[in-house]
A protein has these predicted regions:
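Short acidic-hydrophobic, aromatic-tinged amphipathic segments that line or gate anion-handling sites
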Residues: 99-104
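A short, charged, amphipathic alpha-helix used as a generic interaction element across diverse proteins
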Residues: 108-114
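Residues at or immediately preceding the N-termini of alpha-helices
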Residues: 26, 105-106
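Short beta-strand/loop segment at the start of cytosolic alpha/beta domains
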Residues: 1-16
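Residues that form or immediately flank small-molecule/cofactor binding pockets and catalytic motifs
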Residues: 10, 83, 106
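Amphipathic alpha-helical interaction surfaces in cytosolic regulatory modules
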Residues: 23-98
Length: 114
C-alpha cells in the first residue's frame, strides 16, 4: 500500500494513503504511518481519497494514530474527496464524529489550521 507525505510547514503534515486499508495494507504501512503521524507536526491531514477499500483494521489504525496525535496536543483531520465508499464507511461507523472528516480539501486545510 503506497504512503506519501508532504509538509506545508512545521505544524502541518499531509499524509496520503492509496490502495486497500485492510489487514495486508495496514501491515505494510502501520509503522511508517505512525512515525509520520506523530512527528513534530501538530496537525495531520490524512488523505483517504485514493483508498479503495477500508475495513476495521484500517479504522483502528486511524483511531490509534489520532489518539497519539491528540496526546501531544495535535489533531488529525481526514480528507476523503469524492470517495463515497470510504466516506460512507466512516459515517456508518461514527468515525467522522471522532475525527473531523471532509470532502473538500480547502475545508480540511482550514480545519487543520483553525
Amino acid at each position: 500500500m503506497p504512503i506519501s507525505f508532504d509538509d506545508t510547514d512545521e505544524t502541518l503534515r499531509h499524509i496520503r494513503l492509496t490502495g486497500r486499508l485492510d489487514m495486508t495494507g495496514i501491515d505494510a504501512i502501520s509503522e511508517t504511518f505512525t512515525e509520520l503521524s506523530v512527528a513534530t507536526h501538530r496537525q495531520v491531514i490524512v488523505d483517504l481519497s485514493g483508498v479503495n477499500f477500508l475495513v476495521s483494521f484500517g479504522i483502528r489504525e486511524l483511531i490509534t494514530n489520532a489518539k497519539l496525535i491528540q496526546q501531544r496536543g495535535g489533531r488529525m483531520i481526514i480528507f476523503v474527496g469524492d470517495n463515497k465508499a470510504v466516506l460512507k464507511t466512516l459515517e456508518t461507523t461514527g468515525i467522522d464524529t471522532l475525527i473531523p472528516t471532509f470532502v473538500n480539501a480547502a475545508q480540511a486545510g482550514r480545519a487543520a489550521l483553525g
